[in-house]
Amino acid sequence: MLIPSKLSRPVRLQNTVIRDRLLAKLASTANYRLTLVNCPAGYGKTTLVAQWAAGKSDLGWYSLDESDNQPERFASYLIAALQLASGGHCVKSEALSQKHQYASLSALFAQLFIELSDWHQPLYLVIDDYHLITNDVIHEAMRFFLRHQPENLTLILLSRTLPPLGIANLRVRDQLLEMGTQQLAFTHQEAKQFFDCRLVSPMESQDSSRLCDEVEGWATALQLIALSARQSNSSAQQSAKRLAGLNASHLSDYLVDEVLDHVDAEARAFLLRCSVLRSMNDALIVRLTGEDNGQQRLEELERQGLFIHRMDDSGEWFCFHPLFATFLRQRCQWELALELPGLHRAAAEGWLALGYPAEAIHHALAASDVSMLRDILLQHAWSLFHHSELALLEECLNALPYERLIQNPKLALLQAWLAQSQHRYSEVNTLLERAEQAMRDQKIEVDRTLEAEFDALRAQVAINAGKPEEAERLATEALKFLPLSSYYSRIVATSVTGEVHHCKGELARALPMMQQTEQMARRHQAYHYALWALLQQSEILIAQGFLQAAFETQDKAFELVREQHLEQLPMHEFLLRIRSQILWSWSRLDEAEDAAREGLKILANYQPQQQLQCIAMLAKCSLARGDLDNANAHMQRCEVLLHGTQYHRDWLTNADKPRVIHWQMTGDTTAAAQWLRQTEKPGMADNHFMQGQWRNIARVQIMLGQYEEAEVVLDELNENARRLRLVSDLNRNLLLSNQLYWQMERKSDAQKVLMEALSLASRTGFISHFVIEGEAMAQQLRQLIQLNTLPELENHRAQRILRDINQHHRHKFAHFDENFVDKLLTHPQVPELIRTSPLTQREWQVLGLIYSGYSNDQIAGELAVAATTIKTHIRNLYQKLGVAHRQEAVQQAQQLLKMMGYGA
């Protein structure tokens, strides 16, 4: 929950001086990207900007305190402030910030600016006390903010120091409005107005001017003079003498003598006790002081001018002036040292009662009360965990002595889950083992339910580490004892069980487990696991050969991403990548490439090493188009990423696929042989990951003429794929078997497996898998089409594949261009009939398409002419070639190509 007072613009104080000259300057704020009000404490920065902001509905206000150095907290409040300013316009950014579902602050701000692109009115964001920010991550994000904010959005920063935000650059480009100490110092006229409002007896102009000069227009000093004069019934001149030459660093003694010592003991104690609060309301005051009239007390102090401000229009929330707050806290530590821990405990209890556990934790830490901190964590830690307050939880757990943590095994479990959620996978087992050993040493008993929760986490760790047997045992054991109320651990254990079945190739068992995981995760709003379950379902359906069903499952996942604002999570890249894989399989290459590039955009906010699979996907798209240069450029990027990085074997398999295909297309046997010597040979090919790597190996073996070895590999792959019903893998394997048999001159076997592959492709929709095999595939498909033995659906697919090969790989059709024809006609062995009665360029094109297996309608579509025109071209070229039907024309074209040195 966000504290409302931090998002409320300060209410104008009574008797404030309206500073018209400065307000006139602020009137031009909308013309600048940044307005910076930068001067020491006590010059009236907040009061001035609050005057200017009065009546503006399109303005958000964010009051900082020390806790806002946590990037997640900073982001939540900043977005909330802009939501208030825009009337709730930035719904998606708000959801991302609340759930912490963004890759970085800059990525979140980028989304914010997208949403604000259709907000056309001026918009203002005030951030008060920016000097409290010391986190470089936030500074860097705010530099991004200033570079990219919309033209109609102005940022107003109030700070005691110059913020490290590239101010000089903004100044040079005239995008900065600055106001400093010289501008904010009170003028003689403003000082006169100030004293007239506060003193019973009016002050002469020359006296107020002299006082103003003596304190150099410092508003706080003027306020202290007036306060001291009222409290001691002395003249303002006498009070001023005490302040001569005084500045903010020497205020403490003065405030003791002239402020604290002039209030009664009860009021003094009230002020000191309240100082532990960064903001306060009646309920909190009652907790700290035991007085029932807290609100009345605060209002009375405000009337006395004791540096206390209302923080919102409702008048419910108050805070001390920053200078006075710092002074009071120092005095509290001095005068109430023994009472201070109890005050922080009372404050923590007050915040808990109001429903703000994060603020309560701040006070428990300040009290060094580990028992209270432990109790807060036991009650609220999992809620904070599910709201992604990971940094705060880590601070709390680090503050707890380990023996206290171990005495509460739930906190030991939380610590391990925290490491898991922060992707510190290598630490999780270490934390669990240490906790187990400590609990054994201290004879701490863990009940069976909690042990099951530990098992669920251990199962997740095991599957991440590639240990499916251990993961299955732990997940099964966990599900035996987990009650329905332990929903998170049940989701984890169910997900792991499904993933284990997936890894073992038990797809019929894996799919319902992942569907169950999705339903449970949606019911309990664990949307990360719901998305993960959908991704797993899609991969399982792809493996089963149901690519259309997988595509529709991905649509559900995209819908979940949009609804729950998961766009910036790495899992969104995973979704885009497997969408790209399906689109590539179907030869929708432009869409496949777009999806991979969208994935790279998401990964721009993460380590470059994570880009490997998307870049490999781009290489595959280029290979399917026959664009070897572009494919090579992508693969060089992959090589850079692979160098010196330890990747999971599944990642390596996906990166190796385009490499071995590229070596096949370019005939680079040297690189292929070196890779084969070095690559890891996986174990049993019981899932599509293992099948993929063994296919890479078999492809290289075929390239190197190691036909017997390749046949052994492919026979085993096909046997496993049939047994486990890995239909897509079987489809891919058969295409490699076809290439093997073709190279071995076993044409009958090659044709048999190709026909089975075409039949399976009616289910999978595969096209590009055929296309990348190039000319050898084209020749075989032409022969099958000419035999006219293929069923209609397979025949249509074969013609589509041929068209793609011709389009992307410039095979037979490309040979009948003008240069080829010129060389053909001057060849000494060219038939005399063709030499004396040459075909037109268009007729040569038609002959090439006939040879490629195109029907008349397809030729008409390819050349964008009427079907009747194509019939005329065919009749003419038959006459010139001296042939009577299509089969003879194909044979004639084949002979011409062979004569010119092209294999037929």
UniProtKB/Swiss-Prot annotation:
InterPro entries the UniProt entry points to: P-loop_NTPase, Sig_transdc_resp-reg_C-effctor, TPR-like_helical_dom_sf, TPR_MalT, Tscrpt_reg_HTH_MalT, Tscrpt_reg_LuxR_C, WH-like_DNA-bd_sf
MF terms (GO), sorted A to Z: ATP binding; DNA binding; DNA-binding transcription factor activity
Domain HTH luxR-type: 832-897
Keywords: Activator, ATP-binding, Carbohydrate metabolism, DNA-binding, Nucleotide-binding, Transcription, Transcription regulation
Positions that bind ATP: C39, P40, A41, G42, Y43, G44, K45, T46
Protein's UniProt keywords contain ATP-binding: yes
SMART domains, per database record: HTH_LUXR
One Pfam assignment: TPR_MalT
GO terms of biological process kind: positive regulation of carbohydrate metabolic process; positive regulation of DNA-templated transcription
UniProt DNA-binding region: 856-875
Record text on activity regulation: Activated by ATP and maltotriose, which are both required for DNA binding.
Keyword ATP-binding: yes
Top-rank taxon: Bacteria
Task of the protein: Positively regulates the transcription of the maltose regulon whose gene products are responsible for uptake and catabolism of malto-oligosaccharides. Specifically binds to the promoter region of its target genes, recognizing a short DNA motif called the MalT box.
Family membership noted in the UniProt record: Belongs to the MalT family.
Subunit field text: Monomer in solution. Oligomerizes to an active state in the presence of the positive effectors ATP and maltotriose.
PANTHER family noted in UniProt: DNA-BINDING TRANSCRIPTIONAL ACTIVATOR DEVR_DOSR (PTHR44688:SF16)
NCBIfam families reported in the protein's UniProt record: PRK04841.1
Identification of the protein by name: HTH-type transcriptional regulator MalT
This protein's encoding gene: malT
